[in-house]
Amino acid sequence: MLSFLSSNLSNVRQSLAQVLNFALVLSTAFMMWKGLSVFTASSSPVVVVLSGSMEPAFQRGDLLFLWNRSPRAEVGEIVVYNVRGKDIPIVHRVVRTFPEIEGKTKKVKEISESSPIPNNMLLTKGDNNVADDVELYARGQDYLNREEDIVGSVRGYIPMVGYVTILLSEYPWLKTALLGIMGLMVMLQRE
């Protein structure tokens, strides 16, 4: 009887240790993500290209690394932005910059790279698109605000690595299957 209790306690301890190990892995990944977010000053320091609008520069499934510590965006720079009211990041190139305007009556002029006025307003366009992105912006928005809409500027990429993310979002059953396999592996792991 005593051996039965000790084996059950051992199983409970082992199961608890596995659950704690799994929680440690999850919390470590979360802390690394948040640390990277603070380091890059971007809410999403790594994004996946979801469409072909930036071909040939980036293909669908490319993994992009972002940096958001630059005070201004230059024409030709590739930025990632979120449209107000939507949660899908868009990767496009800056085609024009404008100084920030205070009123509708003030005329907006394009600024040069040597201008001391910060270029906080941006117009973007996908390399593979015919027109600029004004149609993609929120209703009534004619340009992006550098501080409010931009997630970050692209500083590096790894081709095709992000395609796994696209597959998981397009086939939800695959996500469930992978989570089930990972959970089963954690539970069956013996030290």
Curated annotation (Swiss-Prot):
Leader sequence residues: none
Topology in the lipid bilayer: Single-pass type II membrane protein
Gene Ontology molecular function terms on file: serine-type endopeptidase activity
Residues at the catalytic site: 53, 92, 133
Record EC number: 3.4.21.89
EC class: hydrolase
Residue ranges of the TM segments: 19-39
Domain-level remarks: The C-terminal short (CTS) helix is essential for catalytic activity. It may be accommodated as a transmembrane helix in the thinned membrane environment of the complex, similarly to the signal peptide in the complex substrates.
Quaternary structure (record): Component of the signal peptidase complex (SPC) composed of a catalytic subunit SEC11 and three accessory subunits SPC1, SPC2 and SPC3. The complex induces a local thinning of the ER membrane which is used to measure the length of the signal peptide (SP) h-region of protein substrates. This ensures the selectivity of the complex towards h-regions shorter than 18-20 amino acids. SPC associates with the translocon complex.
Protein known as: Signal peptidase complex catalytic subunit sec11
Species whose genome carries this gene: Aspergillus oryzae (strain ATCC 42149 / RIB 40) (Yellow koji mold)
Lineage of the organism: Eukaryota, Fungi, Dikarya, Ascomycota, Pezizomycotina
